[in-house]
Amino acid sequence: NHTQIDNIVIVASEMWQGYIMSWIGKDNLSKFSGFAPAGSSRQHSIVNGLIKAKSIGAVADDNIIIHDAARPNVSERIISQCMDRLSEYDGAMPVLPVKDTIYLSENGENITSLLNRDQLYAGQAPESFKYGKYLEIHNGMTEDDLSKVRGSSEIAYKHGLKICMIPGDECNYKITTKEDLNKFIREMEEH
C-alpha cells in the first residue's frame, strides 16, 4: 500500500505461484502486475523481474525497489527513504553499523587482519535503483556472472553506480535460520 509503489512484480518459481495468488486474493493486492519466473540464481531472478517490469511499461527513468521474502518486516520508512534518495543517487540501500569485531582469515584457521568496524556496514533489503541504469549493467552478463553476485547493490557499485546508504532497522532482519523463523513466529503471535 505504499504510495511510491505503483506496480508489484513477484519473482517466484511456477510451483509457488498458485499459493502466492491465494494470499494476494486475501490481501486484495491491487498493485500486483504479474509473475516473473525464478532464475538459476538470486541475480538471475532479479533480471527476470526487470524484464517483466519492462513488459508492463517500466521506462528508464522509473524507480524500482527490489525486496525479498526473507525480510518480511520492512518498514514504510525504509521504503520511503530508499525511493526518496533516488533523486540524488543511482541506488539506495538500508544498512546497519557492524557491532561485532570483524576478522579476516585467508585460510580459515588464523587471523590475517582486523578490519575497522567503524567503516563496516551490514546491508539489508530492499534496495532501490533507477530502472534504466540498473537494467543496463546486466547487459552481456552470463548466468555464471549472475551466480557470483551476492547483493543487488554489489553489482551496481562494481559498475560505477552511486549507491546511498540509509539507516536500516534491527526489526528488518533476514529469516535464514530456524531460530530466525521462530523469532518471527513469536513476534507475529504477540501482535
Walk through the language-model features, giving the residues of each.
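Conserved N-terminal catalytic core of the sugar/cofactor nucleotidyltransferase
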Residues: 1-61, 142-144
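Structural beta-sheet core signal
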Residues: 9-10, 66, 91-94
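Hydrophobic packing residues within well-ordered alpha-helices of enzyme cores
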Residues: 20-21, 82, 184
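Residue-level signal for inorganic ion chemistry
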Residues: 49, 67-68, 97, 130, ...
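Short beta-strand-to-loop acidic/aromatic patch adjacent to the donor-nucleotide binding site
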Residues: 58-71
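Conserved core of the sugar-phosphate nucleotidyltransferase
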Residues: 60, 73-166
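Glycine-rich beta-alpha junction loops
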Residues: 97-100, 170-171, 179
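Hydrophobic helical membrane-anchoring modules
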Residues: 172-191
